[in-house]
């Protein structure tokens, strides 16, 4: 696997995990879900990320999920596997296992959470993972979830490693601009914030790793295409209509809103695993109206939530 599989990919969906009511993974729901995403312009899939509720998935469940998705996708789009933990040794072993498993363009490794490493600790952590495996690594920098933030300078140190191929950046547009300006040519920068996609792409980002593409993939594709064609007027118009939908999709802890919309669409992705809980019926109704534009007035109103969510 190599960076070439992802070089031209702009819209990556961070795949949710469908569950039965008893909390077991609903593998039968995966084919319809994945076909829905591919029909609406998803160009790659991230498995076992935050949106997949990965903290509640066992290691064996993640491997079973990888195998199931690979069988359905059958090479049609690149796949990225979530491999990172806050234990360097565990992350190394997982990256090795995924490399041996095969079929993945890269592994996504999150900045270590809870133990709050220094910048040097972060550097050593990712270097150790990248040194130990042939699996290309994408760093996931999301301080809202892990408390600590990798600085752009640390990121650029790691970008020199031949096996670290990119970052999913969820900090600030200022950091993203700095990274894009100073990164090596073959280092990919993705925004992990749906609400920032318009700005990030105009700064020169390679793409977006998205939650909203589950429900609004056509709009995202149209916006990205307009930016690619230098039609900023059209792209900006799409972004203005898109922002309330992003707000709705992050108005309560994710992925509860996106699951509510997908269930409404008949995709049967089911509930969430505790400690996350589903939207209330009233929350779900409001979110669905905004995200699917079933009520234009609701879309115009302020929806609780922010473009850069804490969830």
UniProtKB/Swiss-Prot annotation:
Matches recorded under Pfam families: DHDPS (PF00701)
Keywords in alphabetical order, please.
Amino-acid biosynthesis, Cytoplasm, Diaminopimelate biosynthesis, Lyase, Lysine biosynthesis, Schiff base
Q: What does this protein do?
A: Catalyzes the condensation of (S)-aspartate-beta-semialdehyde [(S)-ASA] and pyruvate to 4-hydroxy-tetrahydrodipicolinate (HTPA).
As recorded in Swiss-Prot or TrEMBL, the protein's gene is named dapA
* Record text on subunit structure and interactions: Homotetramer; dimer of dimers.
Q: Which Gene3D superfamilies match?
A: Aldolase class I
Q: What family is this protein classified in?
A: Belongs to the DapA family.
> Where, in this chain's numbering, is pyruvate bound?
51, 209
The primary location reported for this protein is cytoplasm
Protein name, per record: 4-hydroxy-tetrahydrodipicolinate synthase
NCBIfam families (UniProt xref): dapA
Q: Which reaction does it catalyse?
A: L-aspartate 4-semialdehyde + pyruvate = (2S,4S)-4-hydroxy-2,3,4,5-tetrahydrodipicolinate + H2O + H(+)
Which chain positions lie within coiled-coil regions?
none
Q: Which GO terms describe its molecular function?
A: 4-hydroxy-tetrahydrodipicolinate synthase activity
A biological process (GO) of this protein is:
diaminopimelate biosynthetic process
Q: Where in the cell is it found?
A: Cytoplasm
Site described as Part of a proton relay during catalysis, located at 50, 114
Its pathway is:
Amino-acid biosynthesis; L-lysine biosynthesis via DAP pathway; (S)-tetrahydrodipicolinate from L-aspartate: step 3/4
Q: Where in the sequence is the active site? A: 140 (proton donor/acceptor), 168 (schiff-base intermediate with substrate)
Q: List the disulfide bonds.
A: none
EC top class, as a word: lyase
Q: Does the keyword Nucleotide-binding apply?
A: no
The entry's cellular-component GO terms read: cytosol
Instruction: Return the HAMAP family for the record.
Output: DapA
């Amino acid at each position: 696997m190599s960076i070439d599989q992802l070089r031209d990919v702009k819209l990556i969906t961070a795949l949710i995990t469908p569950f039965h009511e008893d909390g077991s993974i609903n593998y039968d729901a995966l084919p319809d879900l994945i076909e829905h995403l591919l029909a609406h312009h998803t160009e790659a899939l991230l498995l076992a990320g935050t949106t997949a509720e990965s903290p509640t998935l066992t290691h064996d469940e993640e491997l079973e999920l990888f195998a199931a998705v690979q069988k359905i996708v059958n090479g049609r789009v690149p796949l990225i596997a979530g491999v990172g933990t806050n234990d360097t040794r565990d992350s190394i072993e997982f990256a090795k296992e995924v490399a041996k498993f095969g079929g993945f363009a890269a592994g996504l490794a999150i900045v270590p959470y809870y133990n709050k490493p220094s910048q040097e600790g972060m550097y050593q952590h990712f270097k150790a993972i990248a040194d130990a495996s042939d699996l290309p690594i994408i760093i996931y920098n999301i301080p809202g979830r892990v408390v600590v933030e990798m600085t752009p300078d640390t990121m650029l140190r790691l970008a020199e490693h031949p096996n670290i191929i990119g970052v999913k950046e969820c900090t600030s547009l200022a950091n993203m601009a700095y990274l894009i300006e100073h990164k090596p040519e073959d280092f990919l920068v993705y925004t992990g914030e749906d609400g920032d996609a318009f700005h990030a792409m105009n700064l020169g980002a390679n793409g977006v790793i998205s939650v909203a593409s589950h429900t609004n993939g056509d709009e995202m594709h149209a916006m990205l295409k307009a930016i690619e064609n230098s039609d900023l007027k059209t792209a900006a118009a799409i972004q203005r209509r898109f922002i309330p939908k992003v707000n709705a999709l992050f108005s309560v802890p994710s992925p509860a809103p996106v699951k509510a919309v997908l269930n409404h669409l008949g995709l049967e992705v089911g509930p969430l695993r505790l400690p996350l809980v589903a939207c209330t019926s009233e929350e779900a109704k409001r979110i669905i109206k905004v995200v699917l534009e079933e009520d234009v007035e609701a879309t115009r109103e302020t929806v609780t939530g922010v473009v850069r969510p804490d969830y």
